[in-house]
């Protein structure tokens, strides 16, 4: 499972990919994108400030794309995922 990040407030996270191994996905019982995001939040601290609020939820203004489909037209947090899937998080909130 690969995560890609765009528009992050953390410059080092911008355009970065994080890949979870099959063992991580299956061993952590990751079945939905919500599970995957919680795992990511817990393991990779640098994702927290740019994409998650203090409850571990995606911040307002973040677009989540699962295998080229907006999660808004899927099942959002309940969308099923598996090893090999691609998830893109895009922050649309920018200072100005």
Curated annotation (Swiss-Prot):
InterPro entries: Beta-grasp_dom_sf, Mopterin_synth/thiamin_S_b, Urm1. GO terms for biological process: protein urmylation; tRNA thio-modification; tRNA wobble uridine modification. Pathway: tRNA modification; 5-methoxycarbonylmethyl-2-thiouridine-tRNA biosynthesis. There is a cross-link at residue 96 (Glycyl lysine isopeptide (Gly-Lys) (interchain with K-? in acceptor proteins)). Keywords: Cytoplasm, Isopeptide bond, tRNA processing, Ubl conjugation pathway. The modification 1-thioglycine is found at residue 96. C-terminal thiocarboxylation occurs in 2 steps, it is first acyl-adenylated (-COAMP) via the hesA/moeB/thiF part of UBA4, then thiocarboxylated (-COSH) via the rhodanese domain of UBA4. GO terms for cellular component: cytosol. It is found in: Cytoplasm. Belongs to the URM1 family. Acts as a sulfur carrier required for 2-thiolation of mcm(5)S(2)U at tRNA wobble positions of cytosolic tRNA(Lys), tRNA(Glu) and tRNA(Gln). Serves as sulfur donor in tRNA 2-thiolation reaction by being thiocarboxylated (-COSH) at its C-terminus by the MOCS3 homolog UBA4. The sulfur is then transferred to tRNA to form 2-thiolation of mcm(5)S(2)U. Prior mcm(5) tRNA modification by the elongator complex is required for 2-thiolation. Also acts as a ubiquitin-like protein (UBL) that is covalently conjugated via an isopeptide bond to lysine residues of target proteins such as AHP1. This is Ubiquitin-related modifier 1. It comes from Encephalitozoon cuniculi (strain GB-M1).
């Amino acid at each position: 499972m690969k995560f890609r990040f765009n528009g992050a407030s953390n410059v080092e996270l911008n355009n970065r990919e994080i890949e979870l191994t099959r063992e991580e996905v299956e061993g952590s019982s990751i079945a939905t994108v919500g599970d995957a995001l919680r795992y990511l939040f817990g393991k990779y601290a640098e994702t927290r400030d740019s994409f998650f609020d203090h409850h571990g939820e995606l911040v307002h203004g973040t677009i989540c794309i699962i295998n080229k489909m907006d999660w808004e037209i899927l099942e959002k947090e309940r969308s099923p995922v598996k090893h090999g899937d691609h998830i893109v998080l895009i922050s649309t909130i920018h200072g100005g």
